[in-house]
Amino acid sequence: MSTKKIEQWEIERYWEIFASLSNGQPHLNSSQAASVLRNSRLRDEQLEKVWDLADVDGDGELDFEEFCVAMRLVFDLVNGELQEVPRVLPDWLVPESKAHLVQAGRALSGRPEQFERIEDEDDTPGLKDGFDWYMNPADKSKYEEIYSANRNHRGEVTFESLQGLYDSLDVPDTDVRSAWNLVNPSASPAINKDATLAFLHILNYRHEGFRIPRTIPASLRASFENNKIDYQVDNARPAQKWGADGSTETLTGRKTKFGDTYLSRLGVGGKGSYTPKGTDFSDTIQDEEWEKVRLRRELAEMEAKLDAANKASEGRRDRPRNDGRPNWVLIKKEALQLLEYKERELRELREGTGRAKEGQDLERLRDDIKTVGDQVEGLKAHLAERKDVLADVRRQIEEERLHR
């Protein structure tokens, strides 16, 4: 059993960040959370997977527990504790209050057990048995693109909004309505995201020649009947999902892939030119925690380079070069360049420019400023020492010349 856990000091740090972003609300939407998550410099697909894992209840927002999960995953990725985003949320990261939701999600994401199927009375020739509720990642991504392109301001999809899709499919109207009724047991005018994905999955299989199922798993039916899920589409459109490769073969290998024609018309599918309309966070205020992480990483890189330079310098010192004398001109030039860089970095931190964006909490950056200041003073002392050594070498050279 894993002994890992989120420590109390981490929870307190995450709470400070959460409170500063939530404006007193109990949840963060995608726009608010992205202002700190994107500062980790992780790739968009990694952040998307982190969000999907952390959003345990699937409401499109992060409460404080889910935010802690997301932050720990991101920090572990940044610090090298994780090489990639895990496929499922580790048990030690699952919030106790949401353990039942994680268990249900895992049951739905895998291949569920096959339920006994009532024999279809449809006499349409050529239809096949073998409908599978499992959605592979490529199909699910395409379903989510269709959902995103047709949802209303409440995050729901109406039957009429998908008429363009129906026209592009080889599915009779009666079967389309049968699939709609199957995922809409309450006969509502619109269905939520989970029901929409299941509806599109049924149409996909029917388009490929499979019979429409007569029943749905109880766990899915419960999620269809729950209309309280709020995906917060008013706040921000979610980032574009990675679509399936257009070269992937269909189930039959004979028809256009489900939804490709429809998505192409919308300009959001396959290899189209669709770009997400989400908020641009490129000018968002940098979070000091990420700044500290990056500074530590840069410091480690600089120390490694310094060690390598020292070793190379020692190697050159052991070899006869320029009458056995070290290249003090080059050493002085490099030391001055490093000093100039550190002074500029310190000046930017004090003035709030450059990496330290306007509006940063300067109180939290004092430690970083002090560290950089100490480095600058150390470099100045080192430069003075090198100058003394250089003067001494010149003096020795001059004395040697006079003795001759």
From Swiss-Prot:
GO biological process, alphabetically ordered: actin filament organization; endocytosis; endosomal transport
Compartments where found: Cell membrane; Endosome membrane; Cytoplasm, Cytoskeleton, Actin patch
Amino-acid positions noted as binding Ca(2+) in the UniProt annotation, renumbered to this chain: D55, D57, D59, E61, E66
Molecular-function GO term, any one: actin binding
Designated gene of the protein: end3
Cellular component per GO, a single term: actin cortical patch
Protein name according to UniProt: Actin cytoskeleton-regulatory complex protein end3
Domain EH: 10-100, 139-227
Coiled coil: 280-399
PROSITE patterns: EF_HAND_1, EF_HAND_2, EH
